[in-house]
UniProtKB/Swiss-Prot annotation:
The protein's role, per its UniProt record: This protein binds specifically to 23S rRNA; its binding is stimulated by other ribosomal proteins, e.g. L4, L17, and L20. It is important during the early stages of 50S assembly. It makes multiple contacts with different domains of the 23S rRNA in the assembled 50S subunit and ribosome. The globular domain of the protein is located near the polypeptide exit tunnel on the outside of the subunit, while an extended beta-hairpin is found that lines the wall of the exit tunnel in the center of the 70S ribosome.
InterPro entries: Ribosomal_uL22 (IPR001063), Ribosomal_uL22_bac/chlpt-type (IPR005727), Ribosomal_uL22_bac/org-type (IPR047867), Ribosomal_uL22_CS (IPR018260), Ribosomal_uL22_sf (IPR036394)
GO CC list: cytosolic large ribosomal subunit
Example GO BP: translation
Protein name: Large ribosomal subunit protein uL22
GO molecular function list: rRNA binding; structural constituent of ribosome
Keyword list, A-Z: Ribonucleoprotein, Ribosomal protein, RNA-binding, rRNA-binding
Coiled-coil ranges (or none): none
Originating species: Prochlorococcus marinus (strain MIT 9301)
Assembly: Part of the 50S ribosomal subunit.
Homology family: Belongs to the universal ribosomal protein uL22 family.
Length: 128
């Protein structure tokens, strides 16, 4: 008889068209990936980057989805995956001397964060 492993529930939240470049957002996401929800919130609160505000908003939304839709406990949640893809670029022009114009690219990105409950250890695993 084969037993199937318990299916892992995952909650996902997306933040689309967030102002800021994807590379700067990825720099923050790389540091919180794999951490617990509480640890990630503390880290995001004290990081000196502008992209932490929209990331915190998406993280709180993912946890709210897990709590409301799947009935998971927020204290056991871990960030299973977090990624940022580049979005559309808004092009603006800056007037310069002698009738020239320099282009300015205002980057946007799409942030996605998924959370799942951390695996709990049974008594047999703890004793070994």
């Amino acid at each position: 008889m084969t037993t199937t492993p318990e299916t892992q529930k995952t909650a996902v939240a997306h933040g689309n068209y967030v102002r800021g470049s994807a590379s700067k957002v990825r720099r923050v996401l790389d540091q919180i990936r794999g951490r617990s929800y509480r640890d990630a919130l503390i880290m995001l609160e004290f990081m000196p980057y502008r992209s932490t505000d929209p990331i915190t908003k998406v993280l709180r939304s993912a946890v709210a989805n897990a709590e409301h839709n799947l009935g998971m406990d927020p204290s056991t949640l871990v960030i299973s995956s977090a990624w940022a893809n580049s979005g559309p670029v808004m092009k603006r022009y800056r007037p310069r001397a002698q009738g020239r114009a320099f282009s300015i690219k205002k980057q946007t990105c799409h942030i996605s964060i998924s959370v799942e409950s951390a695996p709990t250890q049974t008594n047999a695993e703890v004793q070994n």
